[in-house]
Each structure stands twice: as C-alpha cells, then as structure tokens.
C-alpha cells in the first residue's frame, strides 16, 4: 500500500526545512564562523544531494503520469547536480564560483516544471494552488542563487536563498490531495479528505 502523496510531500518538506535552516544559520553567522567545524561546510550541499537521490524512488513509485514522472526526474537530477556542484566548491575540487549557477538552474527548471505539470487553475483545489504558488516562488527566487554566484558574500542573497527553502517547506507542509483553498473547492475536484 502506498502512502498518500501528501505524506511524501511532508517528508520532503522536512528535508527542505532542514536545508533552509542550515543555510539560514550560515547566513546569520557568516561562512567563516559556520565553517569553523569542517563538517558543517558539507551539511547543506550533502543534504541537497541526498534529497535529489530520494526523489528517484518518488519518481519511480509515486507518479501516475508521464508529466509527473518527468517533473520529479528533473527535480532529482537538478538537486543532485546543484548539491554536487556545491560539494565540489566546498571541497575545493571546483574553483570557479560560477558553479553556484547550478542552483539557479535548479530553481528555474523546478519552478517551470511545477507550473507545467499542474493542469488545473489556481483555485481548483489546494494542491493546484500550491503548485502554482511554489512554481512562481521558485522562478522569482532564482534571483537569490544567481546573486550568490555574482556576489558570494552578499548577506541579502544568502538570507533570501535560505528563506526560499523555508518558504517552500511551509508550502509543502500545507499540501493535501483534495482540500479547499481560501474556502473554495471546485466540484470537479471531488470530496475533501478531511
């Protein structure tokens, strides 16, 4: 028996929240203080890479259409690439700060995939609303990882980047399969689960 998709979303929301809190901690104290313990430098890039790995089983076992499978596959690949690029930068294997643009690409492609694979209108049901909201949030928030690549020491870019993951986790925690959004539920969506 498969768990409802909202349970899987909540698990990834927890991962995104941890990722955002690690990034927020680094943004608040600065990279010099954050990296006094060597393992902390690897924490958020490793978590991003691990979330990408965990998206593969979701793509394989929890999707019910080709467009969902492609979207989850794109998210898995880009999270792994962005996490690997950040790990390479931390380790010193990659020298150019332009590798940080991998996360910009991850945000843009993920946001676009969220918008493309949701076929219903904004107020059809809560999951439709959250797909649109999260998609546009990631597309607009792609400015933060881009700013991190251009100005690596920018506090605004680092804080905005961290808060993007926190906001995304809140959106994922709000997910329900069939639930009203702002009191509105399309009659075509079906009966709400709770």
Q: What kind of region is each of these model predictions?
A:
Residues 54-63, 114-123, 174-178:
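Juxtamembrane "helix-exit" motif on the non-cytosolic side of transmembrane helices
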Residues 30-47, 94-105, 152-161:
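Membrane-interfacial loop-to-transmembrane alpha-helix junctions, especially the N-terminal start
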Residues 1-16:
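Hydrophobic transmembrane alpha-helical segments in integral membrane proteins
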Residues 158-178:
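Final/C-terminal transmembrane alpha-helix of multipass membrane proteins
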Residues 3, 61-67, 91-94, 118-126:
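Membrane-interface helix caps and helix-loop-helix hairpins in membrane proteins
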Residues 41-60:
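A generic, lipid-embedded transmembrane alpha helix
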Residues 172-194:
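Juxtamembrane boundary at the C-terminal end of a transmembrane helix
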Residues 12-24, 74-89, 133-148:
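Hydrophobic cores of alpha-helical transmembrane segments in multi-pass inner/ER membrane proteins
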């Amino acid at each position: 028996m498969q768990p409802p998709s909202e349970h899987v979303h909540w698990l990834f929301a927890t991962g995104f929240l941890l990722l955002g809190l690690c990034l927020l901690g680094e943004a608040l104290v600065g990279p010099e203080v954050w990296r006094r313990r060597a393992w902390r430098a690897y924490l958020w890039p490793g978590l991003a890479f691990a979330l990408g790995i965990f998206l593969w089983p979701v793509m394989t076992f929890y999707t019910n259409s080709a467009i969902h499978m492609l979207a989850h596959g794109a998210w898995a690949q880009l999270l792994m690439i962005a996490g690997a690029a950040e790990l390479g930068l931390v380790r010193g294997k990659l020298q150019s700060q332009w590798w940080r643009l991998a996360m910009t690409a991850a945000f843009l492609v993920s946001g676009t995939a969220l918008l493309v694979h949701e076929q219903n209108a904004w107020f059809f049901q809560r999951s439709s609303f959250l797909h649109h909201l999260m998609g546009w949030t990631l597309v607009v928030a792609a400015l933060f990882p881009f700013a991190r690549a251009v100005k690596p020491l920018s506090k605004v870019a680092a804080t905005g980047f961290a808060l993007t993951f926190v906001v995304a986790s809140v959106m994922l925690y709000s997910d329900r399969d069939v639930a009203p959004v702002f009191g509105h539920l399309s009659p075509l969506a079906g009966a709400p689960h709770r």
